[in-house]
């Protein structure tokens, strides 16, 4: 599935990081690397290409959303598929991540079948093209004012 490129997992909780790496291995990904924060993920991505990044949303000093924005703003990294994970997503989290260019969202704890499905969907997408600047941060209520009336 990964065309021999490695997968990068970013999570600040060591047990979850090891668990996700193990799940990826069970799904047939032979080369999976893990890091515990966004700055280290960016450093690694600038040194090596990755088939996919799976990142926790809530991390410090650079959270998953900030990491995603950095990746999408970099022409050499912008086509890297990106999945955000978290124990819960609220409406605003999903909206901000969608605007920033997330390819998928997965709730923790992972169901291996859902993970497998999301991986297939994300890894089979066409590369992005930089046609226009990324949209400014917005909320759906700003884009669709009538939503606030219901």
Question: Model-derived features: where do they sit?
Answer:
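Hydrophobic/aromatic residues positioned on beta-strands within the core alpha/beta folds
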Residues: 85-86
């Amino acid at each position: 599935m990964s065309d021999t490129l490695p997968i990068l997992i970013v999570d600040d909780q060591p047990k979850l990081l090891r668990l996700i790496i193990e799940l990826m291995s069970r799904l047939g990904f032979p080369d999976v690397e893990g890091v515990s924060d966004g700055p280290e993920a960016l450093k690694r991505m600038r040194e090596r290409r990755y088939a996919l990044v799976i990142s926790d949303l809530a991390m410090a000093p650079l959270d998953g959303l900030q990491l995603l924005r950095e990746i999408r703003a970099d022409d050499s990294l912008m086509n890297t598929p990106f999945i955000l994970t978290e124990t819960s997503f609220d409406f605003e989290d999903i909206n901000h991540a969608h605007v920033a260019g997330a390819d998928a969202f997965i709730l923790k704890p992972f169901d291996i079948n859902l993970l497998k499905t999301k991986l297939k969907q994300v890894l089979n997408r066409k590369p992005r093209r930089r046609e226009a600047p990324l949209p400014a941060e917005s909320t759906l209520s700003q884009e669709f004012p009538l939503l606030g009336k219901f």
